[in-house]
Amino acid sequence: MARAKFLREKLHVNVGTIGHVDHGKTTLTAALTKIGAERFGGEFKAYDAIDAAPEEKARGITISTAHVEYESAVRHYAHVDCPGHADYVKNMITGAAQMDGAILVCSAADGPMPQTREHILLSRQVGVPHIVVFLNKADMVDDAELLELVEMEVRELLSKYDFPGDDTPIIHGSARLALEGDQSDIGVPAILKLVEALDTFIPDPTRDVDRPFLMPVEDVFSISGRGTVVTGRIERGIIKVGDEIEIVGIRDTQKTTVTGVEMFRKLLDQGQAGDNAGLLLRGTKRDDVERGQVLCKPGSIKPHTEFEAEVYVLSKDEGGRHTPFFKGYRPQFYFRTTDITGACQLPEGVEMVMPGDNVKMVVTLINPVAMDEGLRFAIREGGRTVGAGVVAKIIK
């Protein structure tokens, strides 16, 4: 094994299984780890080990998620699988497990079911960029025409939610047979075909460091003789001394120049995604900047007040509300580092939202916030989290 350490690390990609209950998501997850371990490295995780997913907390919400890993010839995959439908909803909305792509598992015997549709819709809303399909339980369908029909239905469903249905790779197979080591077309070879589809159809993810610079403002200090220092954790990109930046959100956008980058009281030439840094800003006064704004590459992000969101409302057991809320509900929306009050408009025909529901809503904030589609937020009442959401579409 000594020579393994000379190999350059494989590119890391995050994926997960989605689809209707009992269509075989967990069996497929087990098969991927088994065949990955046999061919490319990693370790086999049995069905029972994956199914007993531990509970974890993301933004105060308890979610059961199984995390497994497997490799292909060129990539290292981190894969999430959830035991229950509610866990998927929470996982996707909170972004607890960000996916670069998803594997939609659909039973060839049953065809698309309500959760198949809901998971595709959620993927669209929360910004899962790519989906590949595994048509499972193909051993239970003798009729080739029936298989084709199910495949057509799945493609139509994907197209309906703006995924490229016609171009999506759809692999027919049986996760159970593959786990048993079956070498027919729908056994082990189908899993290898699926991994190949992941390798080719899901593009290499852009690393945070390669995206335009953005840092949420956590604190602002004025240092006599030096000017104003803004601290925060750099969310993406790289910032160098001398770079021009914008201060966006809450008030009118301002431009300034970074004259110093500090980490742990040391001066640096640059800071990058993941760093906790202090940025010295030229000519900016202490009162010009406040928590809740962001520093960013000029023109890369705009302030907005109105957007469509996909929201999960915490149940009473999760510490959420005990009662439903109605249209005109005005909680605080916690974006990055600050709470901003906003009004909720519910979809037509929805009178109220119960704790434990997920719902699409239009939110109007009282102050503008720097946002992109895909930005996560918490919904709070007096500092207590009562929901989680994601910006699905910016309106203005």
Swiss-Prot record:
Q: What class of enzyme is it?
A: hydrolase
Q: Which CDD domains match?
A: EF_Tu, EFTU_II, EFTU_III
What's the catalysed reaction? GTP + H2O = GDP + phosphate + H(+)
Annotated tr-type G domain ranges read 10-206
Q: What is its main location?
A: cytoplasm
Q: Where is this region: G5?
A: 174-176
Q: What does the record give under GO molecular function?
A: GTP binding; GTPase activity; guanosine tetraphosphate binding; translation elongation factor activity
Which residues bind GTP per the record?
19-26, 81-85, 136-139
Keywords from the UniProt entry:
Cytoplasm, Elongation factor, GTP-binding, Hydrolase, Magnesium, Metal-binding, Nucleotide-binding, Protein biosynthesis
- Region feature (G4): 136-139
| Recorded GO CC terms | cytoplasm
Its annotated compartments are:
Cytoplasm
Q: Which domain of life is it from?
A: Bacteria
**Region of interest: G1:** 19-26
Subunit structure comment from the entry: Monomer.
| PANTHER family per the UniProt record, alphabetical | ELONGATION FACTOR TU, MITOCHONDRIAL (PTHR43721:SF22), ELONGATION FACTOR TU-RELATED (PTHR43721)
Report what the protein is called: Elongation factor Tu-A
Record organism? Xanthomonas campestris pv. campestris (strain ATCC 33913 / DSM 3586 / NCPPB 528 / LMG 568 / P 25)
